[in-house]
Each structure stands twice: as structure tokens, then as C-alpha cells.
UniProtKB/Swiss-Prot annotation:
InterPro entries: Knr4/Smi1, Knr4/Smi1-like_dom, Knr4/Smi1-like_sf, KNR4/SMI1_regulator
Basic and acidic residues bias: start-end ranges: 428-438
Gene Ontology cellular component list: cellular bud neck; incipient cellular bud site; mating projection tip
Region of interest: Disordered: 410-451
A biological process term (GO) from this entry: fungal-type cell wall beta-glucan biosynthetic process
Superkingdom assignment: Eukaryota
Biased composition (Polar residues): 410-422, 439-451
Descriptive protein name: KNR4/SMI1 homolog 1
Entry similarity comment: Belongs to the KNR4/SMI1 family.
One Pfam assignment: SMI1_KNR4
Amino acid sequence: MKFGKLHEFIYSLSTQDKYSEFDPKKSFNRVNTQETELLFSHHNQSTASLIGGPTNDVDSTVNKNQFDGVHEVRLAWRHIKNWLLKYSPDLNSTLQSPCTDADLSDFQKDLNIKLPNCLIEFYKITDGQSYFNDNGSGGLVFGLKLMPIDEVMVMTEHWRKVADYLNSKLLHANQTNKLQELSKLETSHANSSQLKFSSSNLDLIEPVKIAKQQRHESAGSPNIPRQKSIPPGTIHDSFAHPMWIPIITDEVGNCIGIDLCPPTNGGGTWGQVILFGREFDNKYLIADNFGDFLLIFANDLEMGNWDFRSSLANNNQDLLIGSEGELVFVEKGTNKEIPYLEVLKKRCIEKWLSSLNESNSEKSEEIKHLIKDLNSNTSSILKFKNSMDQFVNNNISSIEGISDPIIHSENQIAGGSDNAKNQVKLGETSDTKQDDTSKIASTVSTSDEDE
């Protein structure tokens, strides 16, 4: 017993493992008990009846795509790392040391998954970001945090609770033939007040999903949108799935993750990168593998689609001295600041629509309805003709122009404003230079005469 403690102490001093433990049974991360293995096996087998089709033969798909994206990860990271060293040492300092083989092995056992080799290669380069020394620099991916594997494990468990809850509800509704119960399930982020996220404590309470059901109405409940995927059929039409593994997060419930269980014969690939979360009723396919996604991010950096937003230390808006600020996506040429999730979403839609035009095939009614829905729900942030700052300033100006009913002497205020403007014009055009004291005295005397 004593020798075991001694060996454990020596292990803690000498190992480079961060996730893995000397005694796996005592690990805080050990969540994969025999019961949970059966649970996730049930998820994989029961997905067919709950989300519209049988699952893939995972083993054959894994063998086919196991090396996809590995070279791309190495190439993209070389460009990203060089960019960080040149432009953002603060962001570079948030990157953690690599994961060990033991870390990645235990991580996959805990979640009962096999990671794509390109993602394993990436975590052998860096274990995501740490916020202990971020200096206000924020997330690496244009403000989005690249999570270490321990945070990935915790967030995946939360999303699996979401999927388990929804599957049990849908299964109960199907077994009892009470389809009216489906209309009581909130499926949109806009209607759900019970889905809560925070950076320190991710709580998913009474989460929701719908699976290929038409819109339903119920007393006291508005029409609830279906969950859809872009392109259609590439991702399961569900709010959550136990085999969606979040990798990058905005820390308010939206994620960029990998899909380890795409629909059969739907055009998706094992290990594809998708966009999902509480604000996305539509799920978006943004890359075939994680290596391709990193190349997209690296290309945006190389193209100059970036800027740094000044960081604030506290509510008094004191600037952090020496801080680079948060990396944000700024469209080159227009100088528009756009959330990166919206950028990826827009590109996915444009690529899909372009493929439809190239095929010249007749669009089905479902495709036409989906295109119409996408056009009607396009985020207003993509329609700004000016920068984000200009948009905010215009709204502030319109607010300032509204009359305040509390003020009684509006005419006096307007008159005082006109007098002040006249004084400024006189001061600007006068050939005689006056000091600040004489200008103030002149302004006061003029105001007294008006009164």
C-alpha cells in the first residue's frame, strides 16, 4: 500500500500526462462505467428509429477515412503558429502543451469513441487553450475557444444528457402513440428558456430536440421549427446527438465539433466538422475533416480577414495595458466585423446553393422550402453595409434624437445648443486668436443675454 502511494507520487512528478491518471479507477474523468457503455451502445442502435434512419457501419467508415486530414493539420498549424508568433504572442501563450498517448487513449475510452487520426495528430501538437494566462486575448479561432480534452469530455457529457433526455421523450411518445406530446417539446433556442450555459458552469436543464417531425401546434405554444441540416441529409436532423463531439465553443452553447455518426448514404463523412448548438436549428457542414477546417482558419488569417478588438478590464471600461485585444474576424475590403460562426454558416449555405446551380437538376419542394426558409432567416448582421461600429453609432444617434418627456424646457435646451454651435463657428472662423478663458467668458455672457 505504501509502495503504491510512493509510486503514484513519483508518477505525478515525472509524467507528462495531463488527462490520464496513475490509477484510472480514481480519475475524476472516469465516467465510462459499464452502464454508460450500454447506454451509448443503445444510442447508436436506437438512432435509426428516433432520427430517421440507420447509422453507419462505424468500423468500415473509420478504416476508410482514418488518415484524412492528417497532412492538412500539420500544414495548417505551421501557418497558424507562424502567424501567432508574428502578430499575437498573447494568444500563442494560451496554447497548452501536447497531450500524451496515454491522455488520448483514456479520453477515447471515457467517451467510448474513436477519434479521427487528424484530431489525434492535432492534440499531440497542443491541448487547446488555457485561460489562466490569456491576458484578455480570448479565443484562438476569432474569439472562439479551442477546448482542451478535459473540457471536451465535460461538454460532450452534457450534450449526451440532452440527447438521452430527448430520445427517451420521443421513444415514450412513439410507444404510447401520443403524438400530441411532440408539440410540447421545445425545439428552438428562441423558445427554450431552460437551456442554460455559462463559461464556468455548463448546465443543460430540460434540453430539447425534434427528429424529422413536421411543424406542430399546441395550445399556448407557437409553431416549432424542424431541425434541419445544410446540405440536407449530411447531418442527422436533431437538436443533439451523442456522437457529436464539441471541439470549439463560443461558451454560450454553440459549438464547432466533429460528427462521428453521419446518416447512411446522406453525403456526410465520418469525422466531418459541423456547426451545432442552442442557436442553430439548422446544422451546418463546414469541412470534411478537422484538417480542412484548420486550413480554412489559416487561410482567413493569411488573407488578412482579422483585427484585434481592444479588451476591457472591468465594468468601468478601463483598457488592459499592454493587451493585444481579442482576435475578431473582419472582412477584408469592407472592414465589417462578423462573428465567425456566422461566416462559416454563410459559406456553407453559399457552397450548397452553388452546387445546386451547377447540377441544374430540378429542385424538390422540400429543397425550395428550405431555401426560402434560409432566405427569410438570414442573420441581419450579414446585411450591414458599414462596419459594426457604424451600425452601433447610428442606433445611438437615433436614440439620442428621441425627445425625453422628463425635460420641461426643451426650447431652452435647443436654444442653448444653437448658441454653443454658433460660438464654435465663431471661434473657428475668427481671425483673432482668443485663449480658452476668454472663449468660456464669451459663451457665458451670451447665454445670460439670451435668458
